[in-house]
Design a protein with these regions (language model features):
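N-terminal hydrophobic targeting/anchoring segments and the immediately downstream early-domain regions
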Residues: 2-24, 141-157, 162
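Composition- and surface-driven signal marking solvent-exposed, interaction-prone regions
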Residues: 233, 308, 330-331, 357-361, ...
């Protein structure tokens, strides 16, 4: 096995960059080549049907099912013209990946031959086996029916020879079994609530769109080295491995020159992404060795989320063409930065106004402050839920590790915006509003320079930061489905905007002028949600104590954090917005607890196997060599000199004995602890047991394995070391 390690290292060093052919067309010409976008819809669908479809997508008009046959025919004809032979309903079950079942277009023609067919019924709905996906008890195995239903707002696309149709996935009783269905409901809720508030400022607003711009971080590891690390293969992270002498301390990797093999991978990935309509924009080295980032131009939230799921799938596929494996785990390597997926979120109107962007007049800035403060109120009242939306067994390794946002949700605003809110809070209504001749009402809201958009203070320790014209939710994990965070955030903001309008309307009904009523409520909100505003160092122990004093959620146990989904205020919020029912929330938590348990369980099994089958045998073999050396010393030298010359080896022999004994004892104890935990029927209590007993055991065992790595002869060590995994490109 040690020979395998050195062989794969040698092979990796010899690998050259894969040549990637540059398309003859410009990127703008091959962009969305494999997407059934508006241009293709216009070409392949009758104009009347096309107009109805676009109206449904853009304005939420009901889509008559009778037009589905003509849409399906146009979609099929385009796909066949592109060489496609199969189709699939592409959806995102609660596994956090994507799922698909491929069917061919061919059907019997009744004359002994075959024909290509794709009907509206097949476009609109399919019936996969719902019992085979996580469902939290909503579906029994003998009640397997679940449906995937077409989402016309996200265009179909082609991967290889298959037409992929984005869909939602629901139980036959109507409960959502995926991420897309509640995301669409959350986006609809925030659209309606935001439009109602926007009409205080502009009665012409008819639609508000939530935008998402994600920043995907990832590691690349040579596939030979990856294959020689069973822990990476099975869990996505290294369960053992001592720090490399050099890691990221020189700060020479971030924005550094991109390695040649990696640059070829990035080029290949970008070409594939652009052809699938993913507007990739930025690529660069990240902080840790062999860590990189990809970011697109922001898009409508549902489409952006589909594109992120698709890009993660593409990354896995394209990386193999280049002799790499992509690691999307939030913390594949201990001692260097983990990977996140910052979610840049904002709201925009159909009239072209970015609601999180400052305006040019005091009235515009009142609208801006209105939406910012309502967002802060939503984050304040649901800070535990937002934390639960990004929590997982994998992201827990990253959050709060002095490299990523802490596991306490707070919001950074920066100096300028903080001063504006302080001014409003500390001013009276008469101070803020004065009559100004023919111009009517004058607002004393400080000017917010446009420079703010590019010059907002940067605070990397904040999990939810205002960055000029948007909020950046930085706590989202690199492996996560963005929908989880976006469902929670958009639902909470929608619920808060509804409450805001109700509060303002109540004052207006009492005779208060509209602007005065808005300011009165905003001033109260600024005071109420002050606890969520924190511009300091989120890594400090002082902040943890201060956050607790402020009443923010400071829980660190992931299974307990999930309880936030079932708090009465959370259930009330999701039901009020029509996003999810109590039954759906309960089912999702069952899935979350079960998934957490299974991931820790797999890690425990893998670590136990590696400890017993790799680490202890290698350490014992080296120990035997040391013992033989001591015996030979004793046969060659007088006793006193032999003892002196062998003293260090005797210390190593004893240390190896102690550490291997500790590892064996604690692996056995961990197995027994798993047996005890596995008997617990409650999924919540079982997950808590795994968190409280198995997770600490993994760290204790790892500590001694990593110490052995420093002792054992490098030639004997079977597993690729961090210096090889992180610096061989």
């Amino acid at each position: 096995m040690s020979k395998l390690r050195f062989r794969v290292v040698e092979t990796a060093f010899k690998k050259k960059a894969v040549e990637v052919a540059t398309p003859a067309e410009r990127p703008s010409e091959y962009f969305a080549k494999y997407v059934f976008n508006q241009e293709k819809k216009f070409k392949y669908i009758p104009s009347k049907v096309y107009n109805a479809l676009i109206d449904a997508i853009d304005n939420g008009a009901p889509l008559d099912r009778s037009i589905a046959d003509e849409v399906a025919a146009g979609m099929k004809n385009w796909a066949i013209d592109m060489g496609v032979t199969h189709y699939t309903h592409w959806f995102a079950p609660l596994t956090e990946g994507t799922a698909e079942k491929h069917d061919a277009f061919v059907e019997h023609d009744g004359k002994g031959g075959m024909m290509e067919e794709f009907t509206g019924k097949l476009l609109v709905q399919q019936e996969p086996d719902a019992s085979s996906f996580p469902n939290g008890g909503i579906r029994n195995t003998f009640e397997a029916r679940g449906y995937s239903a077409w989402d016309p707002s996200s265009p179909a696309f082609i991967v290889d020879d298959t037409l992929c149709i984005p869909t939602v996935f629901i139980a036959y009783t109507g409960e959502a079994l995926d991420y897309k269905a509640p995301l669409l409901k959350a986006l609809r809720a925030v659209d309606k609530a935001a439009v109602d508030v926007c009409r205080y400022f502009n009665p012409e607003v008819k639609k508000v769109v939530a935008y998402l711009g994600w920043e995907q971080e990832y590691f690349l590891v040579d596939e030979g080295l990856y294959a020689a690390r069973p822990d990476l293969l099975m869990t996505g992270r290294t369960l053992m491995g001592h720090d490399s002498a050099k890691n990221q301390q020189l700060e020479d990797h971030y924005f550094g020159a991109i390695p040649t093999r990696v640059a070829a991978f990035m080029k290949d990935l970008e070409i594939e992404a652009l052809k699938l309509g993913i507007p990739v924009k930025t690529r660069h080295n990240e902080v840790a060795p062999n860590q990189f980032e990809l970011a697109p131009i922001f898009e409508e939230c549902n489409l952006a989320n589909d594109h992120n799921l698709l890009i993660m799938s593409l990354m896995r596929k394209v990386s193999r063409r280049h002799g790499f494996r992509v690691l999307l785990h939030e913390k594949p390597f201990k001692g260097v930065n983990g990977s996140g997926k910052h979610n840049n979120w904002s709201l925009g109107t159909d009239t072209g106004i970015l609601l999180m962007g400052p305006g040019k007049t005091p009235e515009d800035n009142l609208r801006f402050v209105t939406f910012v403060v309502n967002t802060l109120m939503a984050v304040y009242h649901h800070n535990g839920l937002l934390k639960a939306s990004i929590s997982s067994a994998t992201n827990a390794h990253r959050l709060g590790a002095n490299e990523a946002p802490p596991a306490i949700i707070s919001s950074f605003l920066g100096k300028q915006l903080s001063q504006v809110l302080d001014h409003i809070e500390n001013s009276t209504k008469d101070d803020l509003i004065s009559l100004s001749g023919k111009q009517g009402m004058k607002l004393d809201i400080p000017h917010i320079p446009e420079l703010l958009i590019d010059n907002t203070d940067r605070n990397r320790t904040s999990p939810f930061a205002f960055t000029g014209n948007r909020f950046e939710f930085r706590a989202v994990g690199s492996e996560a489905n963005c929908a989880s965070a976006m469902i929670a955030l958009n639902s909470a903001v929608a619920d808060q905007l509804v409450k805001f309008k109700k509060d303002v309307d109540a004052l207006i009904e009492k005779g208060e002028p509209k602007v005065s009523a808005i300011l009165e409520i905003i001033r109260g909100y600024i005071k109420e949600c002050k606890a969520i505003h924190f511009d300091g160092n989120g890594y400090s122990d002082e902040w943890k104590k201060e956050a607790a004093r402020r009443g923010l959620d400071c829980e660190t146990s992931v299974p307990v954090i999930f309880d936030n989904y079932l708090k009465p205020e959370t259930i009330a919020m999701f039901e009020a917005t029509g996003v999810m029912t109590k039954k759906e929330l309960e089912a999702r938590n069952e899935v979350k607890w079960e998934t957490y348990t299974k991931k820790i369980q797999i890690e425990a099994r893998v670590l136990g196997d590696l400890a017993m089958n790799h680490i202890i045998p290698v350490a014992t073999q080296y120990q035997t060599d040391l013992i033989n050396n001591v015996y030979k010393m004793q046969s060659l030298f007088p006793a006193e000199k032999a003892a002196k010359l062998s003293a260090k080896n005797l210390e190593l022999i004893e240390e190896i004995a102690d550490r291997t004994a500790f590892i064996k004892e604690h692996v056995d104890a961990m197995i027994e602890a798993r047996k005890v935990a596995n008997k617990i029927e409650s999924k919540r209590e079982k997950a808590i047991a795994y968190h409280d007993t198995i997770v600490p055991a993994l760290e204790e065992i790892r500590y001694h394995i990593d110490k052995l790595e420093l002792i054992v002869d490098n030639q004997m060590w079977t597993l690729p070391k961090y210096r090889e995994l992180l610096f061989v490109r």
